[in-house]
Amino acid sequence: MSQEAARDAAAGRPVQIHDPTLRDGQHAVRHSLGAEQFRAYLKAADAAAVPVVEVGHGNGLAASSLQVGRARLSDDEMMSIARETLTTSKLGVLMFPGWATTQDIKNALAYEVDLVRIATHCTEASVAERHLGFLRDEGVEAHGMVVMTHMASPDQLAEECARLVGYGATGVGILDSSGHFLPSDVTARIGAICAAVDVPVMFHGHNNLGMAVANSIAAAQAGAGILDACARGFGAGAGNTQLEVLVPVLERLGFRTGIDLYRLLDAADIAGRELMPAPPTIDSVSIVSGLAGVFSGFKKPVLDIAAREGVDPRDIFFELGRRQVVAGQEDLIVEVALALRAARDGASPASSGTGPC
């Protein structure tokens, strides 16, 4: 598609930006963001008129734990700070059934949360039925999202998203949790979902293969009305779609975001100074994670366990990908590392070193 044709296709169509910098970004700093860091970024995002700002532990409500990491702030503290600080931006939270329960959602509603997003594995939308039904009955905006979507076909994802709408979701979306997609993958999936539902469709990208902005643009051009993006790409692994890049590219293509560019750039500068020791980079392990189709949040524990057990983290990622592991199965990292070490010590090579390319 030429640039002129792309502008004609956009034709001033609105795209709503959701900013999970203070939720997904937590993965990159072991969930250690503090109160003043929250306040600084919340004020900046609010001033830039970012439509929705999402806060929380990297894995959402009630996920702070030994298994996936203790958060420095409690859910209550994060939501309280956000509610006190935001004046124009809506406040969003994420929950995974299994980590969080309906009681955790009730607790979030006490902070007048504007949007609750319920995430499930890409073939398990039915797990969200109870929670979406509760939010529907409460009159709260609720979106259903499916993760690890490279593991499902476009038709399967469309079917799962249609189920989410039937349960009460007022929006649906897909997460490229491992940064595995290319634009054509996104176009096929978003197109199929848009044809199957009559609610806004969302895309959330990761940058393991350097495709997050391109994939997000492909999603918008295929009909997505909501895009996730984080300041400086702050997020797990190689990071998320970079917010301050995505917005002007969308505007240049003719989409409307309603975001103040200069203030958005200011917010990104604050994020760079206050939230992260360094911006995300596409390193060798991140590339392997994307190729293997493994959740980007596994990067730090894989590196730690690989160093401890004396095995190649790339081999761990490819084996985890072969097993199709998902978030919440972090215990399998140790199992895989031990198996690789045993195979090596037994003179049975665990990997040829060539990967799946």
UniProtKB/Swiss-Prot annotation:
It catalyses: (S)-4-hydroxy-2-oxopentanoate = acetaldehyde + pyruvate. Residues 1-21 are annotated as: Disordered. It is an enzyme of class 4 (lyase). Mn(2+) binds at residues 24, 204, 206. Residues 15-265 form the Pyruvate carboxyltransferase domain. It comes from the Bacteria. GO terms for biological process: catabolic process; L-leucine biosynthetic process. CDD domains: DRE_TIM_HOA (cd07943). GO terms for molecular function: 2-isopropylmalate synthase activity; 4-hydroxy-2-oxovalerate aldolase activity; manganese ion binding. PROSITE patterns: PYR_CT. Substrate binds at residues 23-24, 177, 204. The record marks 23 as: Transition state stabilizer. The active site is at residue 27. Its EC number is 4.1.3.39. Keywords: Aromatic hydrocarbons catabolism, Lyase, Manganese, Metal-binding. InterPro entries: 2-IPM_HCS-like, 4OH_2_O-val_aldolase, Aldolase_TIM, DmpG_comm, DRE_TIM_HOA, PYR_CT. HAMAP family: HOA. Belongs to the 4-hydroxy-2-oxovalerate aldolase family. Involved in the biosynthesis of the peptidyl nucleoside antibiotic nikkomycin. This is 4-hydroxy-2-oxovalerate aldolase. The gene is nikb.
